């Protein structure tokens, strides 16, 4: 293994050790010379350690000089990866080493965007203190404050506002942070933004204000808060609708009712502080109720002059009102009210029934009637038996069975109901927070499962494609090898047959040469007879020129080897040729005796089976060769040389005809064998093709079953 391969292996091991947080292995690999490698997503060991929260590994990598600002395939740095999980210790280490704070990923998000989106307020605080740009926008035009408001992260929103983020900045859709908080019904964030003097009259690209958005989505509490903050209900959006018309269009009757009472809500918000002070005074002026037996005991000792009547209380109240300055002088007014409290609220014990007049009761009733208890008060009144008795009171029976009296306009259930309402609201908020966290976890798990499933599907697709390609190439190689083997076998058969035919032809030629050489020797022996045998030798050609019987006998006497040679040659050729040449062997059997009777028969009788033009020509040549003998006078005797030449030419013609017939039969046999080989090869190819298609179909079915299993 070369040095580069060794370094690459060490780098891969460094990635694994950084991912698992193996500090000792990281130190050893760095000392051995491992360099910074990246994963298939472009992430370095610093990315992996920062995301997994391995602080010691991050510190070692920083000391080793690892680049802080390397971006992966999603353009995220190690700071992004640490911010996503909210690891403040690693964030502190990276910031201390001087990493870039405002690097943007492929969506334009900085590390501050990630911290605000996930609600890691401590991470956001660290980044803001380190000098991160709080006004940076992503590709959608959202700042970090937009993302914090969208996910209802109040603490992150507060930190960003304190860090200098502007609540009136708009994204690409023209929405401010107030639009976003109103859209997602985050009441606490809306209040934070209103306390930060965020404008309630800003419009987005559709011309909607935050009040339009809340009215369209039926967010009653947000609408109420916006109205109390002074939102204008007459602003018209691009569709020509006011917030009231928008609420009616979306069938939100409760919000529409709030918007119709908008002036009353504004007056209520302006006079809320005054009402609180009045309620406080009302509570302090009320007398405490006492048990009925104590009231009965005190009736005899109390005179009518000691009890202030309603006529005396009304002038005192009017004097107190005259002494009160305008609403602008609130401190003096509070001081004067505190001074006048003992005079107004100093009620004595109830007077006897005989001393109470109807007029006094009416005046007291009219005097105390406007002082009703507010429904939305959160104070908890003392038990009814702790009050002093009013002139008008109601009776009730306590837990111990005693008859008690209480103010006629009071309600003991109201503080309990208010307490239950507060507890219910707190429980609802907790449940919402829990649901949000559970939803985030479920979404994260589903995202992980989806990514894992997609990765597995990609791997399976690649494996199936590779397997199919390998099977296809293997089948093609097998087909090619089979075709090549068939071709080689055919060529070998053809070469063997050609060699056999050549050998047979050479044997025939050699036999002919031997026969011709034997005939020439006999001719030479006959051409030099003794003088006493000259007369019979001259008479033999004359006898041969006679009738056909004489020619037959002369031919059998002169050449006894011709028939034997032809018969043996034909027999040997019949044994050497394949069984398909039976017709050729029969033809040779016909031709062999024809060679012995060539002087007696004409050209048409030489090759009757073949019926070729050459046979006709051979007959003509034979006829022409016999004409001189027939036309020659009986007194002339042909020479022995002319007869030998004629016999040799006839033998050559017969041999030529024989070879032509044999070659024609061999060509037919070759063509038939080639056709058989082709048909067999085509059948085998079709069978292999059908087998291959069946195999491919089974593989596709297996792939479909795997996909359905993975999707389930």
From Swiss-Prot:
Gene3D superfamilies: Ankyrin repeat-containing domain (1.25.40.20). PROSITE patterns: ANK_REP_REGION, ANK_REPEAT. It comes from the Eukaryota. Residues 298-313, 598-613 have a biased composition (Polar residues). InterPro entries: Ankyrin_rpt, Ankyrin_rpt-contain_sf. Residues 362-378, 614-625 have a biased composition (Basic residues). ANK repeats lie at residues 9-38, 41-70, 74-103, 107-136, 140-169, 173-202, 206-235, 239-268. Residues 277-382, 521-647 are annotated as: Disordered. Recruits CKI-epsilon to the beta-catenin degradation complex that consists of AXN1 or AXN2 and GSK3-beta and allows efficient phosphorylation of beta-catenin, thereby inhibiting beta-catenin/Tcf signals. This is Ankyrin repeat domain-containing protein 6. The lineage of its organism: Eukaryota, Metazoa, Chordata, Craniata, Vertebrata.
